[in-house]
A protein has these predicted regions:
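N-terminal helix-cap/turn-to-beta initiation motif at the start of protein domains
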Residues: 19-34
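C-terminal motif of bacterial Sec signal peptides marking the signal peptidase cleavage site
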Residues: 13-16
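N-terminal glycine/threonine-rich, aromatic-flanked beta-hairpin/loop signature
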Residues: 46-92
Length: 146
């Protein structure tokens, strides 16, 4: 009986921690995202202090692309030829990003999404934690980049 109570409590705790993603939240995906850390299935974490590339999402009507971009010191971005077509899929209380290239298809579940944080989980139960990013401007004496 005690074990059943512990399992029930842990299940409720897990369910209550998950954010409900609404269709109106999807617009928050648009923009530049920098990976902060990766959390593996057994809880190990890998932190990223600095990234050479950001993910740029451009989604409209639940379809769009994710492109790898490289921030430059003058506040601009170089775009690589690497991109994935992205579709947003709502399945019950879960929301997925379905990716497709010429060579592969895969999905990631959106665990949480806010104006400045994004967490997704892949089928291998690896979580990717992102923070919203912007231009890096180390030139022009700190003038704000447009």
């Amino acid at each position: 009986m005690k074990n059943a109570f512990i399992v029930l409590f842990c299940s409720l705790l897990f369910v209550s921690c998950k954010q409900e993603i609404k269709p109106t939240d999807i617009a928050k995906l648009n923009g530049y995202w920098e990976i902060e850390k990766v959390v593996f299935e057994k809880g190990e974490e890998k932190e990223y202090k600095m990234n050479e590339t950001f993910d740029f999402f451009q989604i409209k009507n639940n379809k769009g692309v994710r492109t790898k971009v490289m921030p430059q010191f003058d506040g601009t971005f170089l775009t690589t030829d690497t991109f994935e077509n992205v579709s947003v899929r709502f399945a019950g209380d879960q929301v997925f990003l379905d990716y497709k290239t010429k060579y592969a298809k895969w999905s990631e579940e959106i665990i949480s999404l806010s104006d400045d944080k994004l967490v997704v989980k892949n089928p291998q139960k690896i979580e990717y934690h992102y923070k919203k990013a912007g231009p890096v401007n180390l030139l022009n004496d700190g003038e704000k980049t447009k």
